[in-house]
């Protein structure tokens, strides 16, 4: 694994959060390309609709833009589900964070960018990085 980045939902959320100092960092990460999962797309749609009050059209446009920048989304499979349960049990993360980590491992990524997980922690060959830690 080398130079393969996976984005947690928070990266996508901040990329569309005008006026937030984290937006520029998130936009730069996404512009470089990387990996996401179907779960990330679904979580983005939920947060964008409920918290950001985006219309369905705006959500669709934002997700289409993300999908042009990223590799095809990793599907949520039974194998990823099982790996996510094992990660949750071993590392104590919530199941949804653990599924993100399992999807990143399945995509053979070496870095997952997330604000919500422990910066610098390694899960197998995967390293968690908080790109906003210095803001």
Please place each PLM-identified region on the residue numbering.
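Short, well-structured N-terminal submotif of metal-dependent ribonuclease cores
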Residues: 1-37, 51-61, 135
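Acidic, PIN/NYN-like endoribonuclease modules and their adjacent C-terminal/linker elements
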Residues: 2, 101-135
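Acidic active-site catalytic centers that drive phospho-/nucleotidyl reactions
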Residues: 8-10, 43, 97, 116
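Active-site-proximal, substrate-binding regions of enzyme catalytic domains
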Residues: 43-70
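Active-site neighborhoods of divalent-metal-dependent phosphate/nucleic-acid chemistry enzymes
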Residues: 72-115
């Amino acid at each position: 694994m080398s130079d393969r980045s996976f984005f947690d939902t928070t990266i996508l959320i901040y990329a569309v959060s005008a006026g937030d100092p984290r937006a520029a960092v998130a936009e730069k990460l996404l512009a470089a390309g990387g990996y996401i999962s179907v779960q990330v797309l679904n979580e983005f749609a939920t947060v964008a609709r409920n918290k950001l009050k985006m219309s369905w059209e705006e959500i669709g446009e934002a997700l289409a833009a993300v999908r042009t920048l990223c590799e095809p989304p990793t599907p949520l499979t039974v194998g990823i589900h099982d790996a996510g349960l094992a990660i949750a049990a071993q590392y104590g993360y919530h199941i949804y964070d653990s599924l993100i980590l399992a999807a990143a491992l399945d995509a053979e990524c070496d870095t997952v960018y997330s604000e919500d997980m422990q910066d610098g922690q390694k899960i197998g060959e995967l390293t968690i990085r908080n790109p906003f830690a210095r803001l």
